[in-house]
Amino acid sequence: MSTVYETLYILRPDLTDEQVELAIAKYQNLLQEQGATDIEVQNRGKRRLAYEIKKQRDGFYVQFNYNAPGKAIAILERAMRLSEEVIRYLTVKQEVTKEKEDKVAVTA
């Protein structure tokens, strides 16, 4: 069973645009390998952090919205935790509204 998730992560500011794109592709491929579907990627660009994280004041913000089984989240977060390029990440489960549930039931 798949659940809708949103993952937002921050990459180090000293990465080049090419390295940022490679990092995005790496995590997107990791999700696909774990059975994630409907992956939406939003590269929010370089932004100022509210406070210093790992001695960094800026970071590249990237957001994923996707459907995935629960085991995929543990694998994705483990990869991010071990990575030197990710300075912070957060995954939240999205609530499916009643309207969306009805729409899915009608189309099924």
Curated annotation (Swiss-Prot):
PROSITE patterns named among the record's database cross-references: RIBOSOMAL_S6 (PS01048)
GO CC annotations on file: cytoplasm; ribonucleoprotein complex; ribosome
InterPro entries named among the record's database cross-references: Ribosomal_bS6, Ribosomal_bS6_CS, Ribosomal_bS6_sf, Ribosomal_S6_plastid/chlpt, Transl_elong_EF1B/ribsomal_bS6
GO BP annotation list: translation
Keywords noted in UniProt: Ribonucleoprotein, Ribosomal protein, RNA-binding, rRNA-binding
GO molecular function term, any single one: structural constituent of ribosome
Alphabetized CDD domains for the sequence: bS6_chloro_cyano (cd15487)
Signal peptide extent: none
Functional description taken from the UniProt entry: Binds together with bS18 to 16S ribosomal RNA.
Protein family membership: Belongs to the bacterial ribosomal protein bS6 family.
The protein, known as: Small ribosomal subunit protein bS6
Provenance organism: Trichormus variabilis (strain ATCC 29413 / PCC 7937)
Gene: rpsF
